[in-house]
């Protein structure tokens, strides 16, 4: 399963690449669990302020943008991003160079191998990743091994009821034996244009606007 996922994200970079972090973050955009604004919840004893934000952050499954975004918005932190996709990491490197993010390091690495980094982290972000692993529980266990005793982990997993419309469409496309080809992506796009408006309104994910999201 991991090899299939890796091949998909090599072909289609995900999420949609951000070209300028200053412009993106200037619109008030940030990560949903970012310590720079949730630290009072994560460390109510004031540890984050005492350390002036000098924490060690791991972005596990960073995709095309997340590690660079964390480094940009947490300039005093040391940020490590890992991902299976070299194509995604290359875009992270583009952002790193563009914004001179000296506090960012990037590695092509599986979550199951995270202990090979030889580091312990104050904060771990893993959004929309663990459920793609062959054994999500093992992935979570490995992340826990590199989390400091007073560390915080921010996770997002797909929820059944919030994505029921997506799962129905996925089942339909599986029955059509669609594969990860440009032609089959075109079939998906055409199908979406034929859905009733009420159904489309329940599928208003930004991912539907570009091929990698589909």
Briefly describe each language-model feature range.
Residues 11-55, 69:
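Conserved alpha-helix/loop element of class I SAM-dependent methyltransferases that forms part
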Residues 63-76:
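Conserved SAM-binding loop of SAM-dependent methyltransferases across substrates and taxa
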Residues 85-87:
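Conserved SAM/SAH-binding beta-strand->alpha-helix loop
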Residues 98-113:
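Conserved SAM-binding strand-loop segment of SAM-dependent methyltransferases
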Residues 112-124:
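A short acidic, Gly/Pro-enriched loop at the edge of an enzyme's catalytic core
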Residues 122-137, 153, 159:
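A short SAM/SAH-binding and catalytic strip from SAM-dependent methyltransferases
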Residues 137-151:
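A short glycine-rich, Lys/Arg-flanked "PGG" loop and its adjoining helix->strand segment in the class I
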Residues 152-206:
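Conserved class I S-adenosyl-L-methionine
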